[in-house]
């Protein structure tokens, strides 16, 4: 039986009354966002809106993005990536559990020096996935060209974010490439491995 989204008590500033709000709303008040599922358009729109709101409220404070995601849609992930680059607030990315595929890309997209992982986290990079079903050959060719274009763009961005050569990124992402938190640090996808919130 699923437990659902937990609720926690929250007192609005200046109020004597407590209200029960879902845990994600309460964390959002503290500028803590959570990517804990596959990346899709709905998740991306929600995270983009929250980052834009928090940035407009106070761009001098960091936004904390916790990531435990198997990855997902490239286009949805790029909307989150572009927003991380767009906002004035520093975006601290924290891997808890797994950051795979687009999840790893977003982990590496955080503010340099502020990309961290917990000790037992796993990070996985690979080339973008594309699938075709019974379609015309010309449509398959168009889709293949677009996937190759996206692959090059993602690999160039990973190269910039990690400091690894484009050629190394291309080779490593040809298949699933798993890294421990320490290995991800050595690779340049994150800056530190942490075990306490004050270290982020």
Curated annotation (Swiss-Prot):
GO terms for biological process: protein quality control for misfolded or incompletely synthesized proteins. One of its GO terms (molecular function) is ATP-dependent peptidase activity. Gene3D superfamilies: 2-enoyl-CoA Hydratase, Chain A, domain 1. The active site is at residues 101, 126. It is an enzyme of class 3 (hydrolase). It is found in: Cytoplasm. Transmembrane segments: none annotated. It catalyses: Hydrolysis of proteins to small peptides in the presence of ATP and magnesium. alpha-casein is the usual test substrate. In the absence of ATP, only oligopeptides shorter than five residues are hydrolyzed (such as succinyl-Leu-Tyr-|-NHMec, and Leu-Tyr-Leu-|-Tyr-Trp, in which cleavage of the -Tyr-|-Leu- and -Tyr-|-Trp bonds also occurs). Its main location: cytoplasm. InterPro entries: ClpP, ClpP/crotonase-like_dom_sf, ClpP/TepA, ClpP_His_AS, ClpP_Ser_AS. Its EC number is 3.4.21.92. Coiled coil: none annotated. Keywords: Cytoplasm, Hydrolase, Protease, Serine protease. GO terms for cellular component: cytoplasm; endopeptidase Clp complex. NCBIfam families: PRK00277.1 (NF001368), PRK12553.1 (NF009205). Fourteen ClpP subunits assemble into 2 heptameric rings which stack back to back to give a disk-like structure with a central cavity, resembling the structure of eukaryotic proteasomes. Belongs to the peptidase S14 family. HAMAP family: ClpP (MF_00444). PANTHER family: ATP-DEPENDENT CLP PROTEASE PROTEOLYTIC SUBUNIT (PTHR10381:SF70). Cleaves peptides in various proteins in a process that requires ATP hydrolysis. Has a chymotrypsin-like activity. Plays a major role in the degradation of misfolded proteins. This is ATP-dependent Clp protease proteolytic subunit 3. It comes from Synechococcus sp. (strain CC9605). The gene is clpP3.
